[in-house]
């Protein structure tokens, strides 16, 4: 998601 530091990693890592 856009509320996580990994949102840009794959697309939806954190949720």
From Swiss-Prot:
Keyword Secreted: yes
Cellular localisation: Secreted; Nematocyst
A single cellular component GO annotation: nematocyst
Record flagged with keyword Secreted: yes
GO MF terms held by the record: antioxidant activity
Keywords, sorted A to Z: Antioxidant, Nematocyst, Secreted
Major localization class: secreted
Function: Has strong superoxide anion radical-scavenging activity (EC(50)~16 ug/mL).
Other comment: Has an apparent molecular weight of ~90 kDa.
Name of the protein: Antioxidant protein SmP90
């Amino acid at each position: 998601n856009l509320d996580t530091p990994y949102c840009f990693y794959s697309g939806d890592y954190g949720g």
